């Protein structure tokens, strides 16, 4: 799936060798400022490395068509960006960008419910809390059926009970649909409970 060799990025990351396996959940842990978010950006070619190789399916991410890569590998930031006025429009936005067929409303609502987001499709995005926007971004991305989801603290704004429910549903959906999850989390409990693999990064290096 992903393979990194001899990767260096400024003074932020220095990774000799790292692989992410397909159809697994990898949790990335470590102190703030250690390079976790930067690693996700490298995987999606949002920033360019100074040295080494980042390969996706055996091909350098820099050689992939950017649009195609980001359809296959979707990244959700800790504070996800929303593009539209209503919840329904937000869930449909990815399909309209690619001219793909938009799912039926029942499918949109079902995905929201799986992510513990019980809102009408007509609800204005601007009235959602930070945690609700995180769940909306997860639902929007899962509907697009990516090969890989890169998640940067996807549940940081949720209470513990809701966080566990959302991550459980996310993990179940990913396993059933062959989606690879690479998730940054500060919660060791989440990493140990849901991660097939755990990668710890400190000061830009794999521990």
Residues of each region from the PLM?
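Helix-to-loop junction immediately C-terminal to a conserved catalytic motif
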Residues: 44
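Conserved ABC transporter NBD signature motif
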Residues: 52-60, 69
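Conserved catalytic motifs of ABC-family nucleotide-binding domains
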Residues: 80-89
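Conserved ABC ATPase "signature" region
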Residues: 103-120
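Conserved ABC ATPase signature
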Residues: 124-128, 132
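Catalytic Walker B motif of ABC-type/P-loop ATPase nucleotide-binding domains
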Residues: 149-153
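Helix N-cap at the start of a conserved alpha-helix in ABC-type nucleotide-binding domains
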Residues: 160-162
């Amino acid at each position: 799936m992903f393979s990194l060799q001899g990767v260096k990025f400024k003074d932020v990351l220095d990774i000799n060798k790292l692989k992410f396996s397909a159809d697994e959940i990898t949790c990335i842990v470590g102190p703030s400022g250690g390079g976790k978010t930067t690693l996700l950006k490298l995987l999606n070619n949002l920033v360019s490395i100074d040295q080494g190789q980042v390969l996706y399916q055996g091909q350098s991410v820099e050689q992939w068509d950017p649009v195609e890569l980001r359809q296959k590998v979707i990244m959700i930031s800790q504070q996800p960006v929303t593009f539209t006025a209503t919840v329904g429009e937000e869930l449909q936005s990815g399909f309209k960008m690619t001219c793909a067929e938009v799912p039926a409303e029942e499918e949109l609502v079902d995905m929201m419910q799986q992510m513990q987001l019980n809102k009408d499709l007509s609800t204005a995005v601007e009235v959602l809390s930070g945690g609700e926007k995180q769940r909306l971004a997860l639902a929007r991305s899962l509907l697009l059926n990516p090969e890989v989801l890169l998640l940067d603290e996807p549940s940081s704004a949720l209470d513990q009970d809701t966080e566990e429910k959302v991550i459980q549903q996310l993990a179940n959906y990913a396993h059933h649909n062959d989606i690879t999850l690479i998730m940054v989390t500060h919660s060791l409990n989440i990493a140990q409970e849901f991660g097939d693999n755990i990668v710890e990064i400190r000061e830009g290096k794999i521990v």
